[in-house]
Amino acid sequence: MRPLRGFARTRRGIAHAVYFADLLRLAEMKRVAAQVAEHEPRIDVLINNAGGLFATRRLTEDGLERTFALNHMAYFVVTEGLRERLLASRPARIINTASAAHQGATLDFDDLQSAKSFGAVKAYRRSKLCNILFTRELARRLDVEAVTANCLHPGFVATRFGDQSGGWMSHIVRLAKFFAISPAKGAQTIVYLASSPNVAKTTGQYFYESISAIPSPAAQDDQAALLLWQRSAALAGIPELP
């Protein structure tokens, strides 16, 4: 809560609201999306920026592996829950935080929950590939004149990411942060995608340092993007929309 109190002190007079949810639970994602849609008259920008790295494989109450649930399904469910509000707010923008860690990752659609083979880094890399494929399919389904969807690699940023990963993973992440960039620098591409007129009609792209970049071949697979969307909708119990 300290960062929120700091925001309130430095942004006096600017209306803002805070909504809380457990990002590992599908029901919570649906609830908070419905709550935001009900109370916010318009949404100009949606930034999906949740993420985690877990040392051990555990399932959520929905039967989803935690990395997949937090890093991908949370994005999917919240975005779908806010789709109508975003369309009504046109022009609007959706920004998904991905990562260069997707490079070299592949998806096994017969094992999205990593039951056959789990590794903390492997699961994380897969989830970041999901972010890019989700963005790609989302952009295909949205009218660029109404809502754009892009994703980005922010760089390795010195935040609290990974602090609660558990076991040896937490120690490795903490040590690596000595070489990380500042949160302000890590936010630059997000701010650019959220506000720059240069990308007002750009959609379905992957960015790094405010420049459109080429993701891995696996991240450019339109069939995989469609299949991931269909599987995600089924897992979340969300009707297929065009």
Label each region the model flagged:
Residues R2-P3, F20, M29, M169-I172, ...:
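Extended hydrophobic/aromatic segments used for targeting, binding, or gating
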Residues L107-L112, Q164-G167, Y206-F207:
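Short, flexible, mixed-charge acidic loops at enzyme active sites
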Residues A158-R174:
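A glycine/serine/threonine-rich, flexible loop-to-helix segment
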Residues S127, C151, V173-P215, Q220-L226, ...:
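C-terminal helical subdomain
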